[in-house]
């Protein structure tokens, strides 16, 4: 208990001041920040960094307290501006810039915790979202049951504010935060739902939601370490700062009342937990009743600690060999490969059946076509269409854009067990590129291909990947064919895109 108190005191000393550096420290405006949040695999957002300036945020926060500058039209609903600008645009600027400022100290704190855990050397290798799949290939084939869990989120923004207050020291920060979430948001929309706020202020909502997930995972990891025979080394523990022990005792009492045991009953050394965004995968090798205990643990944790309602029927426990789960834009399941081996001992011959488990990862073709249709590359049936908005660009720019999209898709989905779906997506993009160029030159597709040469024109769509692989591996046709059949994970993919978002 003493070491826990020391940890709590040390963690309280790390509470941050936010408004002081935001308002008074000029050097913070020179910080370069990477805006990977809105990057899309289909279209790059231009001018994102120029729109959200910390200097503008500082001026807006200063003017929020000057009431004579605030001009609102309560009777005229057609006027949607104050200070001479659009309200939603000002709100977006404040939320984005505000999220940028508060992310900086927490990122530095995460880096310091990684140094304390002595895994800072491998931190760069863990940044790639593709690093999850080699881990699943090594571990998941030894497990028997899997639970696909969608993490519930609070229905009220005040719950997210209460979670954030464990880390923040200055009270004016919360006055500004509640002003923005309650009063300010009421100017923008009559619907005060959290879904509306998440759509209008995605970056700021993502910041608050990440802290909710961080707090819930910190308690889970803390209790997991106490209930496991093995010691976890690759996790940093961030558990709740205020009223942690009374809540923990209450949670233990709930389990003792329901199951007549404490957390020591839920000892499962062979369990793995993987999360990305709002979905997590829980896999276990032991009997399903232990998975059921962890299921009820998550439900009680969300209800008792965070006042978040979760329906038990939404958490299913399925045999891994019979169930496919979706994670990071892939469909994954464990396939059983059966083979018969003939064994002979003296004059007796035996047939031995060997079952080998293999992780099968496939590309979800329907969500991919839906994403392409949303980006106006094809219709909902997968038939390619032209991209008229790109017709004003040069031929080189149009081809370069389509090649960049194909390259991103090829890199991301090269880990698939079957490449047929990936080749179909490339075919859709190739025909969409041809139709876009034909639309620009005001000719038919057949006439354009006849004039430019169909074989040489779009050969880059299929030869570029082979040229890259030939630089790494020997120029052998059999080697390249084998590489096309096998999975290749690119461990330099650092940003998410529309394809991996859980809907």
UniProtKB/Swiss-Prot annotation:
User: Pfam families under this entry?
Assistant: Intron_maturas2, MatK_N
Main localisation: plastid
Keyword set for this entry? Answer: Chloroplast, mRNA processing, Plastid, RNA-binding, tRNA processing
GO MF annotation list? RNA binding
Q: Look up the record and report any one GO term of the cellular component aspect.
A: chloroplast
A biological process from GO:
RNA splicing
Report if keyword tRNA processing is assigned. yes
* Record localization: Plastid, Chloroplast
- What does this chain do? Usually encoded in the trnK tRNA gene intron. Probably assists in splicing its own and other chloroplast group II introns.
Per the record, the similarity remark reads: Belongs to the intron maturase 2 family. MatK subfamily.
The protein in question is named Maturase K
Source organism of the structure: Vicia sativa (Spring vetch)
Gene expressing this chain: matK
